[in-house]
Amino acid sequence: MTLIHMNILMAFSMSLVGLLMYRSHLMSALLCLEGMMLSLFVLAALTILNSHFTLANMMPIILLVFAACEAAIGLALLVMVSNTYGTDYVQNLNLLQC
């Protein structure tokens, strides 16, 4: 495993730890998810470039499209929750609260 792969995997794991630690605010969770998706994109692009697997050239682009859709839906949800409740706490998204 090369140093670049280790750095990308470390970035992914740090984003995952950030998602697990700072999950009370929706904005922090969305930023950590975006970091995870970007590190997966770079890892997929590097893997395809190193292996010369031409059939999978579109996989990083498809991953980037899904990341953009996830970010757009997350920001729309953030705007809706902050307009409704005034805060961006994730606990406001739970509809089963008493």
UniProtKB/Swiss-Prot annotation:
Species this chain originates from: Eschrichtius robustus (California gray whale)
Pfam family, one: Oxidored_q2
Keywords: Electron transport, Membrane, Mitochondrion, Mitochondrion inner membrane, NAD, Respiratory chain, Translocase, Transmembrane, Transmembrane helix, Transport, Ubiquinone
EC number: 7.1.1.2
Enzyme class, broadest EC rank: translocase
Hydrolase recorded as keyword: no
InterPro entries: NADH_UbQ_OxRdtase_chain4L/K, NUOK/Mnh_C1-like
Disulphides: none
Protein name in the entry: NADH-ubiquinone oxidoreductase chain 4L
Biological function: Core subunit of the mitochondrial membrane respiratory chain NADH dehydrogenase (Complex I) which catalyzes electron transfer from NADH through the respiratory chain, using ubiquinone as an electron acceptor. Part of the enzyme membrane arm which is embedded in the lipid bilayer and involved in proton translocation.
Gene expressing this chain: MT-ND4L
An MF annotation (GO) of this entry: NADH dehydrogenase (ubiquinone) activity
UniProt entry tagged with the keyword Transport: yes
